[in-house]
C-alpha cells in the first residue's frame, strides 16, 4: 500500500512533461461523440470555402460546429489553408449525411455571400446619397455666403469671396 501512495504523490516524469509541452494545442481536441460510428471516419468528404464565408457559416471560433454536427449526424473539421484565405472543411459520416451537410454548408455560404453583396450595394447607395446631399447643402450655404464650422467653402465660393 505504501507504494501506491508514493506513486500518487510522485511528481510527473520530466520527459513526459517535456513531450506534453512540445505537442501543439488543437482547438478541436475531443472524443468521438457516442452517436457517431467509428467506421464512418474512413471516407471523408472535403470542400473548400473562402475563409470569411466559413467564419460566418460556422461561427467565430467554430462555435456552431457541434450544433451542425448533431443536426446532420456528421462530424466536421475546419482547417485554414492558403495562408488563411481558404477554409478546408472535412465532413465525416455516411455518404447521405455528408451530402446533406455539404448542401447545408453551401446553401448557407451562398446566403451569406448574397447578404454581403446586398449590404455592399446599400452602403454604396448611402454613400452616394450622402455625397449628393452634402454637395447640395454646401452649394446652398455658399449661395447665402454662410460657412459651416470646420468645412471650407466649395472652390467657386472661395473665388467669389476673393474677388469682392
From Swiss-Prot:
Its main location: cytoplasm. This is Oocyte-expressed protein homolog. Expressed in ovaries, where it is restricted to growing oocytes, with greatest levels in fully grown oocytes. It comes from the Eukaryota. Residues 44-105 form the KH domain. Component of the subcortical maternal complex (SCMC), a multiprotein complex that plays a key role in early embryonic development. The SCMC complex is a structural constituent of cytoplasmic lattices, which consist in fibrous structures found in the cytoplasm of oocytes and preimplantation embryos. They are required to store maternal proteins critical for embryonic development, such as proteins that control epigenetic reprogramming of the preimplantation embryo, and prevent their degradation or activation. It is found in: Cytoplasm; Nucleus. Component of the subcortical maternal complex (SCMC), at least composed of NLRP5, KHDC3, OOEP, and TLE6. Within the complex, interacts with NLRP5, KHDC3 and TLE6. The SCMC may facilitate translocation of its components between the nuclear and cytoplasmic compartments. As part of the SCMC interacts with the SCMC-associated protein NLRP4F. Forms a scaffold complex with KHDC3/FILIA, and interacts with BLM and TRIM25 at DNA replication forks. Contains an atypical KH domain with amino acid changes at critical sites, suggesting that it may not bind RNA. GO terms for molecular function: RNA binding; structural constituent of cytoplasmic lattice. Transmembrane segments: none annotated. Keywords: Cytoplasm, Nucleus. The gene is Ooep. GO terms for cellular component: apical part of cell; cell cortex; cytoplasmic lattice; nucleus; protein-containing complex; subcortical maternal complex.
Amino acid at each position: 500500500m505504501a507504494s501506491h501512495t508514493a506513486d500518487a504523490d510522485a511528481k510527473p516524469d520530466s520527459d513526459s512533461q517535456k513531450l506534453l509541452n512540445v505537442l501543439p494545442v488543437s482547438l478541436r481536441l475531443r472524443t468521438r461523440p457516442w452517436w457517431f460510428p467509428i467506421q464512418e471516419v474512413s471516407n471523408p468528404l472535403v470542400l473548400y470555402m473562402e475563409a470569411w464565408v466559413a467564419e460566418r457559416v460556422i461561427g467565430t471560433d467554430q462555435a456552431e460546429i457541434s450544433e451542425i454536427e448533431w443536426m446532420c449526424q456528421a462530424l466536421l473539421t475546419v482547417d485554414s489553408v492558403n495562408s488563411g484565405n481558404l477554409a478546408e472543411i472535412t465532413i465525416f459520416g455516411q455518404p447521405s449525411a455528408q451530402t446533406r451537410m455539404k448542401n447545408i454548408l453551401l446553401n448557407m455560404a451562398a446566403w451569406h455571400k448574397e447578404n454581403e453583396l446586398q449590404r455592399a450595394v446599400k452602403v454604396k447607395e448611402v454613400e452616394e446619397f450622402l455625397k449628393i446631399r452634402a454637395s447640395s447643402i454646401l452649394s446652398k450655404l455658399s449661395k447665402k455666403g454662410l460657412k459651416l464650422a470646420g468645412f471650407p467653402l466649395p472652390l467657386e465660393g472661395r473665388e467669389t469671396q476673393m474677388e469682392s
